[in-house]
Amino acid sequence: MKQPKTKETIPSQTIVSDFFENLGNKSYFLALSLIIFIAFFVFKDFLLLKNVFQFKDIGSDTLNGMYPYYHHYADYIQKNGWPQWSFAEGMGQGILSGFLRDPFQLIAMLIGPQSMPKIFIYIIVLEIIIAGSIFYFFMKALKTTNYSAIIGTLLFSFCGFMIIGSCWYLFTFEALNLALLLLGFERIYQKNKWFLFSLGIFLAAISFPVNLFTYGVFILFYGAFRFLQENDFDKKKFFGLYGKLIMAGAIGLLISGPFLLENIFQVLESPRGSGGDSYFDKLANSPMFATSNKVEFGTSVMRMLSSDILGSGNSFSGIQNFLEAPFSYCGLISLLLMSQIFPLISKNLRKWYIALLIIWLTPTFFPYFRYAFWLFSGDYYRAYSFFLSLVFILFSVHALDLILKHKKVNLIALISTLILWLILSSISYKSNITYPNGQQGIQELKSDDTIAFFVRLFLVFYAILIFMLGKSKNITNIKYILLIMVVFELTYISQFSANRRSIVSARDLKEKIGYNDYSIEAIKYIKENDKSFFRVDKSYFSGGAMHGSITDHKVHSYYGTSSYNSFAQINYINYMRAYNVIDKNNEFASRWVDGLISRPFLESLNHVKYVLTKEVSKNPVWLNTHDSVAKFGDVVVLKSKFNLPLGYTYNQYISQTDFDLLSTIQKDLVSLKACVLSDQELSNTIGLKRLTLKDTIELNQFTWNYLKNSVDSLKNESLKTVLFSENKIEGNISVSKNKIMYLSFPKDKGWHLKLDGKETETILVNNGMTGIYPSSGKHSINLEYHSRFLNKGLILTLVGILIAGIFWFFNRKNKVAII
């Protein structure tokens, strides 16, 4: 393909042949070696197993979220195979969506839960290495020199998004994914080869399709920039390029079919995706051109200089918190180099650089545009910070290349930029804020003096070296010094983010603390003595982090009632809302659900047979509802006296309208007598008695005999389970008259019921759970779960493969490779 003309101000000179350029294609191995070198020293205590890559501070998601998440999948795959439904996700949920949130974690899942948590750091470093490698080839696709490509690769591999993101287990893959999309874009743009772009879209779709929007926004602007960087605007060619991207992207989307559909519908059908997001109206109605306050702006500025200059972990003094504040650090040298691009390119080309920079800087000054970038779903930075870093890296690498080619540095731009950053790093940032409790206060950023001194010192050194690149006749030694400084800076700055934290040590895994506490012996005892299906609630947390761990059951392999899930099963949440377990008006409450531990009557109704506690006196009700059956260390095992099986029957019902009028305790008590039906379902209740408001009782009328008699009545005609597994339940029931059977798991369209061998629809009971209408007599019950979109998704996959095959055939016919 004929290369477009370069639009530079100064005629290009020949790059001086030196060590870096003489390496040729082998320069990749130098870049790779440097990535591995820096990664080792940044993460050495974790790689050498002195510490475990888990954090007890604000990064507690590694302990409370991601570790239980992947441990559960690994355990599930070993016992059940392909992920479908799990009773350990809340009180039951399909888990195919989210299975490949980070496809590289499949390594840990297939090795097994015993590999966790020690294996996580190796997977993360592997992702950094692969992401950096892909970005190197992207740099070379832009025709940069070997030296500039190596510098750019290192800046990318150890930018703030990559390193802080690694401490959240999520963002290293997302950085890798975008690097692949950028390389794929260049392959389409330059050589009409679409495979890598399709692969990038495929990986995004099986991981988290929502990212396709943010990636798409970046590619949209980057694609226009690249086209106009090298061509005059030509409508046919311009939109033809986007047409190729859409076609290549469509192939990737189609091939991802089963995961794409499952992921999309999990989001859409969750509380977060189906409405009630308290943030949307607030953010969408905020003033468009309201500026960031001083602390918000200062945090953005300071975290461009270093991710940890405002403190690490819980000592962070900026807005939000250490993980969710802006983190656009991408090497100090990039902050000085990027201003050099403007005097070294033509006026016509300069306007496109300025336009791209304004597009990505605007949300830093005007938060409304950052909210819009996230579709007003939250006050996030994350990918936005990363994209801003990428623009800085691209500009600085191009500027470095031009300096090396032309041996010219604009001294005014260099000194002005240096002074600007020295001033920005030194001034005070404070502003009035309103705390969540409504109180007013003043927040002031506090910088780490050691890191701040290092930053200013290196800014000055970099400025001197950049100046010398444009003046010295022999710049090879300067290039060596500059590269050594970049390697040292990235190692020094990055190690704070991972190491200056509250960390789980290797010794912790051997002590009877954290997830290795006496809960293990307690659960083992229960399982040895009870082979049936049951649920367990805990009144304490095992995780050991600053935030309580409500997904202990995923690590200790038992079924509970709590959930930590951004996209929880909607009927599970509706049930919790209906019984006032969580705030029905707060969407955030749907992501962190403590379960039924504080509601003993609901525990009885939902097959919570055991409670683990360290303080029996914590809930006086337990003295009447449970027996203490064992103790291990400081953990007491309580067994319910009033446990109901998985399925039991009601002969009474109460309408949803009447139920909603009851107090919290009345709701619990009435559910011991009647199930709750929607008003639309009332016409199908032939032969059943309706319970009205006058039939309900108050707490002062409650007796323990009332509880015993109610439980005995419900249990009298209940499901006798013959087979129970995650995806299949078989049993028998005999009822004396028409009744409603309550099954204590959320109603889901993936469950298929056969009543006496005939396909039968389940009904919604108690505002979220599964119900069946058994008529008088004996019945066989067969329930099977099938991922709803697996078959439809496989059809999309076949269509995608067919289209890809057609593309491959015609490209082969025209002697054009696809890769």
Q: Positions of the model-derived regions?
A:
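Contiguous transmembrane helix-bundle modules in multi-pass membrane proteins
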Residues: I188-W194, S198, F208-L212, L349-Y515, ...
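Extracytoplasmic/lumenal acceptor-recognition loop(s) of multi-pass membrane glycoenzymes
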Residues: A88, Q93, M485-I513, K524-S604, ...
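Start-transfer (signal-anchor) and selected internal transmembrane alpha helices
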Residues: M1-L48, K237-G249, K471-M485, L802-I819
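Periplasmic/ER-lumenal interhelical loops and adjacent helix-loop junctions
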Residues: S60-Q84, Y242, G249-L344, F369-W374, ...
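Membrane-embedded helix bundles of polyisoprenyl
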Residues: I35-F37, I128-L142, N146-N231, K244-I264, ...
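Hydrophobic alpha-helical membrane-insertion signals
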Residues: I15-G94, V267-S270, S502-S505, L509-V555, ...
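Active-site-proximal, structured, solvent-exposed surfaces of multi-pass membrane proteins
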Residues: Y69, R690-I819
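Active-site lumenal/periplasmic loops and adjacent helix-entry segments of GT-C-fold
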Residues: D45-K143, Y147-N177, A284-A325, L753
